[in-house]
Amino acid sequence: MCIRDSLLTGEDIDHSDRRENFQNTIFRLLELGALPIINENDTVATAEIKVGDNDTLGAVVACTVKADLLVLLSDIQGLYTADPRKDPGARLIPVVEEITADIEALAGGAGSGLGTGGMATKLRAARMVTGQGCDMIITNGDQPQLLYDIVEGKQVGTRFLGRRA
């Protein structure tokens, strides 16, 4: 599997010609069997054109290209019943069918040290994409093998099920 980083800003989403360009790039990467990794281009993103976090940016891109699946990487395996770094009894939640108030309450516990978002932004991203029928997985970015497992259809991390019309 080939992985390609795609650096975007808010302007790439807001302007139709730039949006079409990044959509075509993502579709071509997928045709070539590459896995697009979406990150905000912090070197050129100003406050006016900044999305703010990669979780939200990934969700916006997934909705724009009508993706079947969005994978968000974290420094933990997924969504837990409690913060796994503080509570040894915390259990991984393998599947979330609906983002309820109880699920949202779990987001306060385990933020990611890898970026600006934490679990709260990951749940907002999940709400955004699942509402468009796209599944989303949160898993550990420190374990690259997990991406292969996802491609092979194995249960990895926490999967949020998209609502199908």
Please annotate each region the language model reported.
Residues R4-A165:
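C-terminal catalytic "cap/lid" subdomain
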